[in-house]
Swiss-Prot record:
The active site is at S191, D404, H444. InterPro entries: AB_hydrolase_fold, Tannase/feruloyl_esterase. Belongs to the tannase family. Involved in degradation of plant cell walls. Hydrolyzes the feruloyl-arabinose ester bond in arabinoxylans as well as the feruloyl-galactose and feruloyl-arabinose ester bonds in pectin. It catalyses: feruloyl-polysaccharide + H2O = ferulate + polysaccharide. Residues 1-19 form the signal peptide. GO terms for cellular component: extracellular region. One of its GO terms (molecular function) is metal ion binding. Disulfide bonds join C29-C78, C64-C117, C190-C445, C259-C276, C285-C295, C505-C527. This is Probable feruloyl esterase B-1. GO terms for biological process: xylan catabolic process. Its main location: secreted. Ca(2+) binds at D260, D263, A265, D267, I269.
Amino acid sequence: MMWWFLLIGLASAAATASSASSASFESRCQHFHKEIHLQNVHVLSTTYVPIGSNIPMVYNPPICGGTASSSISTIQFCQVALNVTTSDKSQFFMEAWLPSNYTGRFLSTGNGGLNGCVSYADMVYATQYGFATIGTNNGHFGDTGQYFLNNPEVIEDFAYRALHTGTVVGKALTKLFYPQGYKNSYYLGCSTGGRQGWKSIQRFPDDFDGVVAGAPAINFVNLCSWGSRFLKITGPPGSETFVTSAQWSAVHNEILRQCDALDGAVDGIIEDTDLCQPVFETLLCNSTAVDKTSCLTGVQANTVNEVFSAMYGLDGKWLYPRMQPGSELAASFIYYSGNGFKYSDDWYKYVVYNDSNWDHSTWTLADAAAAAAQDPFQISSFDGNISGFQKAGGKVLHYHGLEDAIITSDSSKAYYKHVADTMGLSPSELDHFYRLFPISGMGHCSPGTGAASIGQGSSTYAGDDPQDNVLMAIVQWVEKGIAPEYVRGSKMSRDGTIDYRRKHCKYPKRNRYVGPGKYTDENAWKCV
């Protein structure tokens, strides 16, 4: 089968590990701290975690979920907790999990939002595959920007330094713990984690051989401004510009009415949002309408049109793409609720203006210009020249959900075009090292209405076959040279079984229903 190389790697690792008993592995772990003498690294603990035990998360603070995020270990591993000093005003916390079923592969996980919290779920997922796995708190604990206030060192950790330094430390620990060192290094992250992956590609092209970057928060500063812009468009609840959640439901139904069948199948899922250019004047209330919850006033129709339009600066230059249609049910509670967006608010309060009293209702495009002019430590992570990564032989699998209600998938398509234009490469030339997969029916880093479980984490596991598992797909691409032509997603039922599967096309191709089977038949679709 296609994933034979993974199983061989696991079997080989198991054979190596079995030469030493669990007792010797436990002893090795408990004494490992004596071998760690790395600059600016303070070892907090080394803990042996046996199979079937609760994974200790004693350093995970309540603001990050505390011990509530604990899970049962399916393997035995050595858990190393450390603090790493990055300046006289900053440090980050990290953990390295070193499994007994080690496959010779190193992996770093990313973060989300403005956190601040180790991605323990991703660490569990990767470690069970035999990766020596690390995760950091990205320079501060908690999903908040308050630690950025008047502290550029903490911002630098968040922008790139915690991940890069953690990777350097993690690789050193891996070499210390395993005599054979590591063969290949990988990265797995989504959202902020996706941005971190791209920042590593752009600034540290030798850090990873393979990167899985999902729904990346690239063009980060303008993304923050885009999040602030929605309040300006919608106004507060009760204003004539405000659209209620019930009306957004009507908007969603109208979008599906106009766009669902464009891919050839009426299944409640939009396969290519680029083709979806809805007209909302069809929802205008007539003079006799009694129920105004399912129609729009002219002012409200203008609000909806603005929501689905790109953001341009005071000078008329493009800043950020439109929100893709199809995400409005979730986005109505995130961006269109008539309140500020937390991450955008925090960025302006604690970074742009260093003023915790800044009022999000005052935001204008002048603020967007001020924020963009700063772009501290190039956190926007939108550099189109990734030739260093290309020359290093790196591979990146980039995915983005087409129902993402937090970061529009149009941003990923814009970055793909930016890379192509900057490097002067065609899609077939980019294919050698960079492939983008828009995933229909996927929300923000997680399943939505469609076949969107693609193995990016434990909660979206649908098998070990590389076509069903993006982590295994990047391993196969790096180690066997077999690049993914598609990513097959699974629609999971509540009991954990698979309802149906669908192959998601490599951009810029799009999925088209051609029959003759039902839309749930993966072979009834074709990439065109």
